[in-house]
């Protein structure tokens, strides 16, 4: 990696040539970008993207990837002509019960800051890797909570007009792991708008949001629907996530992943009834708008893909990409995986679940230059 000396063209942002992207993602897979532009402020993000989009209109630019934490990306190793723009604007401010975070802020730092200021509402989202700006794009959620529960507005750069404005959360068309941002994106490289800042309105009473998730309630030893100390909820969530390999640890290959690779499918009630009648024992399910939500991890394991799949033969080599030994939904890089290895395993699992149950799992991460 070397500096190109072109930072002045991007309002002082750092510019480097030939930068490997794999170390900048939680899956640790990806190509060497032709150019990496790191923006330390929202002003640098705006200036950089305006310039790159002007170059695009003139037909003079490479494909542009905009990212921050790299926690929800599978980038094809073939995308060697990329200009990557990394959001490193990481300011966090608190005013009363409002928490504002710039797009590049580490998400778990945002959660911890809120809790340290006595604010409840984000604690169930503790330990989720990635950046604050990415959370509204797919309406990040865990343990019965979603970003849309407390998000009031986002500050965005419209790349078509070059304008910057605040957009109310009510206009973001949130759904299960989706939003207007995700639906309008083409292939992850031609996103029409970029989140610069997010704002949350939280509970200043010193209580958590109601604990809606049974596993978390059991960990806290409280009834479902009860509120608790946000710090206690955070610690319980982190403990649950750690046991599932969902807290980043450079020494643990079970955490080299994008988290859950597939979303929990929502099916029609008759599909659920048919499934429940065809297997022994209960089928994990939850009510959802428009149908019944099934547990993707249960489907994966019941289709024959247990934790650690594919398990190496005794004394034999380990596959470069395997399911986590702790969580059946995490596809993990065992140290040498490339994007093709990840996609191949994802296809095998998707096709296997479809063959057994007639249900097609949908990938949760953004796939850049590759597809299932």
Curated annotation (Swiss-Prot):
Cofactor list: FAD
Residue span(s) of domain FAD-binding PCMH-type: 29-205
Compartments where located: Cytoplasm
GO cellular-component term (any): cytosol
A GO molecular function held by the record: UDP-N-acetylmuramate dehydrogenase activity
Listed GO biological process terms: cell division; cell wall organization; peptidoglycan biosynthetic process; regulation of cell shape
InterPro entries in alphabetical order: FAD-bd_PCMH (IPR016166), FAD-bd_PCMH-like_sf (IPR036318), FAD-bd_PCMH_sub1 (IPR016167), FAD-bd_PCMH_sub2 (IPR016169), MurB (IPR003170), MurB_C (IPR011601), MurB_C_sf (IPR036635), Oxid_FAD_bind_N (IPR006094)
Keyword annotations: Cell cycle, Cell division, Cell shape, Cell wall biogenesis/degradation, Cytoplasm, FAD, Flavoprotein, NADP, Oxidoreductase, Peptidoglycan synthesis
Principal location: cytoplasm
Signal peptide: none
Active site: 177, 260, 364
Pathway: Cell wall biogenesis; peptidoglycan biosynthesis
Assigned EC number: 1.3.1.98
Reactions performed catalytically: UDP-N-acetyl-alpha-D-muramate + NADP(+) = UDP-N-acetyl-3-O-(1-carboxyvinyl)-alpha-D-glucosamine + NADPH + H(+)
PANTHER family per record: UDP-N-ACETYLENOLPYRUVOYLGLUCOSAMINE REDUCTASE
Known role: Cell wall formation.
HAMAP family in the record: MurB (MF_00037)
Family to which this protein belongs: Belongs to the MurB family.
Name recorded for this polypeptide: UDP-N-acetylenolpyruvoylglucosamine reductase
Biological classification of the source: Bacteria, Bacillati, Actinomycetota, Actinomycetes, Mycobacteriales
